[in-house]
């Protein structure tokens, strides 16, 4: 929780510096996010209760992903990932990823032995019976297809990584990583050869200077900003002449690197590593498979999402357009991130309580590692 608060606070400071008009809205979303965090802890007394409603939660996640295809859907920045209810616009995919993590965790606990052993195969390669793997593949496939047609490849990659990591942890079979990598490579080639927006992003990634005043302008300005920051940065509010469009969302890490330098950017990355590490420690200490898988999946969501956006800003990967958890501007992202942390805290607190009861020790209310 302290790490999430630090990242959220840093994000607010940077947003207030970039666009003071957005600072008030970000503060409102922060208050609502903390309220959601508190509400989840108050209502959800045992994280394992979520597994009882796995099919409902999984279906809810898919409905959230499909919502932008309805008349309520709105296209912003070329991606149809938003839903509008009057003056309120939100991104349902931020909540769908948490719902699918719950579904995957519950389903993999039930079927992990069958998935690990495999029922048929060729030679030494054992493949699970499709009827056991089918529901997970359907949820994964529908998520990826919908996200690709919404031109939101960042979320597609995030859902894919969530699926592969949780399947690997559930079965302890490294072959799933190999299969996942193969599927990713095939999907990347297919997306590049099929979708114009993917081809444009790859071209901009490989050579932003080819159209530096057009499609390559954002990433070029981001590169200049990071270089301008040097080791110690230009100082808060001293970003000079380098202006990055939409810096408060996709490119906020570039602004951090510019104003706080390499040291500040590294500190942010360390904070994310500590947050993910705390989540994984919660997973390791869990006393039941569902909590272990769910904590692993939630931790993977934070780590992979942070990696994707930082890698996009620094041109390690093509830019995907997702947000930096807790730091970027946006109500949906902030609420989804606080919901995720609330589940991690509930898992940690529940396991600590049960461990204390087994040891005959008094239970301390609210004690948690995450």
Predicted segments with their positions:
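Hydrophobic alpha-helical transmembrane segments of multi-pass inner membrane proteins, especially
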Residues: 1-218, 254-312, 339-343, 358-370
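Long, low-complexity hydrophobic alpha-helices enriched in A/L/V/I and glycine
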Residues: 51-55, 95, 225, 231-232, ...
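Glycine/serine-rich anion-binding loops at beta->alpha junctions
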Residues: 86-96, 150-151, 230, 234, ...
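Transmembrane helix boundary and interhelical junction motifs in multipass membrane proteins
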Residues: 152-157, 232-236, 247-249, 262, ...
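TM-adjacent membrane-interface loops and short helices in multi-pass inner/ER membrane proteins
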Residues: 208-252, 262-264
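Transmembrane alpha-helices of multi-pass inner-membrane enzymes
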Residues: 317-355
């Amino acid at each position: 929780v302290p790490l999430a608060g630090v990242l959220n606070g840093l994000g607010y400071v940077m947003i207030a510096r970039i666009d003071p008009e957005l600072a008030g809205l970000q503060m409102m979303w922060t208050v609502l996010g903390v309220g959601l965090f508190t509400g989840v802890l108050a209502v959800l007394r045992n994280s394992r209760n979520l597994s009882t409603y796995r099919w409902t939660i999984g279906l809810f996640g898919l409905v959230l992903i499909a919502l932008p295809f309805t008349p309520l859907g709105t296209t912003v920045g070329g991606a149809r990932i938003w839903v509008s209810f009057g003056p309120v616009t939100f991104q349902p995919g931020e909540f769908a990823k948490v719902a699918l993590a719950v579904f995957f965790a519950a389903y993999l606990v039930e079927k992990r032995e069958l998935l690990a052993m495999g029922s048929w195969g060729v030679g030494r390669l054992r493949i699970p019976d499709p009827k056991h793997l089918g529901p997970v593949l359907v949820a994964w496939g529908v998520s990826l297809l919908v996200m690709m047609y919404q031109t939101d490849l960042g979320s597609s990659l995030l859902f894919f990584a969530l699926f592969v990591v949780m399947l690997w942890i559930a079965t302890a079979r490294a072959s799933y990583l190999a299969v996942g990598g193969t599927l990713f490579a095939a999907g990347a080639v297919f997306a590049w050869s099929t979708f114009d927006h993917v081809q444009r992003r790859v071209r901009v990634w490989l050579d932003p200077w080819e159209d530096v005043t057009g499609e390559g302008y954002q990433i070029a300005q981001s590169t200049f900003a990071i270089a301008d920051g040097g080791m110690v940065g230009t100082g808060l509010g001293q970003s000079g002449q380098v202006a990055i469009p939409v810096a408060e969302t996709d490119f906020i890490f570039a602004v951090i690197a510019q104003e706080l330098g390499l040291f500040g950017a590294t500190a942010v990355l360390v904070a994310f590593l500590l947050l993910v590490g705390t989540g994984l420690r919660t997973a390791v200490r869990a006393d039941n498979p569902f909590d272990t898988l769910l904590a692993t999946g939630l931790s993977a969501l934070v780590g992979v999402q942070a990696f994707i956006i930082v890698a996009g800003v620094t041109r390690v990967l093509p830019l995907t357009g997702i947000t930096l958890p807790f730091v970027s501007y946006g109500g949906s992202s902030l609420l989804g991130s606080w919901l995720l942390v609330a589940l991690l805290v509930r898992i940690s607190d529940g396991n600590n309580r049960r461990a204390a009861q087994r040891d005959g020790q008094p239970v301390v209310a609210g004690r948690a590692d995450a």
